[in-house]
UniProtKB/Swiss-Prot annotation:
Belongs to the complex I subunit 4L family. The chain crosses the membrane at residues 4-24, 30-50, 65-85. It comes from Cereibacter sphaeroides (strain ATCC 17023 / DSM 158 / JCM 6121 / CCUG 31486 / LMG 2827 / NBRC 12203 / NCIMB 8253 / ATH 2.4.1.) (Rhodobacter sphaeroides). It is a multi-pass membrane protein. This is NADH-quinone oxidoreductase subunit K.
Length: 101
């Protein structure tokens, strides 16, 4: 049977991959957004694993809310990215600081 340690190991691996994705690739906004989603997925796996281990459904319900917010965050981030690409022709992180209102 898969124990709590296995879920925590997978979650820690996803968190480390997400952190490395942000620090190693500082130019592409899409990779940064995907790395943030990986880190949120790691948190969700932790919530579900501990919720199942303790026999409480609160963590699983909270995970549904986090997934909903993460989906909205990804949609808004990609919409801003598409608009920025249409206006500037690039998606480099260094060029984002020219977005002044």
């Amino acid at each position: 049977m898969v124990g709590l340690e296995h879920y925590l190991t997978v979650s820690a691996a996803l968190l480390v991959i997400g952190i490395f994705g942000i620090f190693l690739n500082r130019k592409n906004v899409i990779v940064i957004l995907m790395s943030i989603e990986l880190m949120l997925l790691a948190v969700n796996i932790n919530l579900v694993a501990f919720s199942s281990f303790l026999g409480d459904l609160t963590g699983q319900v909270f995970t549904l809310f986090v997934l909903t917010v993460a989906a909205a965050e990804a949609a808004i981030g990609l919409a801003i990215l598409v608009t920025f690409f249409r206006n500037r022709g690039t998606i480099d992180v260094e060029d984002v600081n020219v977005m002044k209102g």
